[in-house]
Amino acid sequence: AGRLRPLSLSENAMRRVCFLLKVRSERLEAYRRVHEEVWPEMLEALSRHGWKNYSLFLRDDGLLVGYVETPDWDAALAGMAGEPVNARWQAAMKDYFESLEGVNPDEAMRPLDQVFHLA
């Protein structure tokens, strides 16, 4: 009782992925507005490539927390990389973020290590 089980994924499990980005302080309201009307073709592409339960959370200081569930994170990223709508979306989003070091926002998403999960 009270012991934690190690984290593992079964063959059919969805992987929970969380990442952090930083939105520029002067772009916070514009970032919020653009996400009120994400392009339908972008939403369709995300769904087609296994992005499920995808959420973004934005703190007032610009910290953006992204969360998504997918069976295969690498395949989900690769699938979106081949979508023309994603190239357009990433180009449109690029100037909203700090510290991208010359890459698109989707290339700067580095998954955090999950250390606990209560199902």
Identify the function of each model-found stretch:
Residues 49, 70-108:
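An amphipathic, aromatic/His-enriched active-site/gating alpha helix that lines ligand/cofactor pockets
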Residues 43-65, 69-71:
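Short, glycine- and small/hydrophobic-rich beta-strand elements in well-ordered beta-sheets
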Residues 16-22:
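Active-site-flanking beta-strand signature of metal-NTP-handling nucleotidyl enzymes
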Residues 14-16, 61:
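A general secondary-structure signal for short beta-strands and their flanking turns/coil
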Residues 1-13:
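N-terminal amphipathic/basic-hydrophobic helices that include classical n-h-c signal peptides
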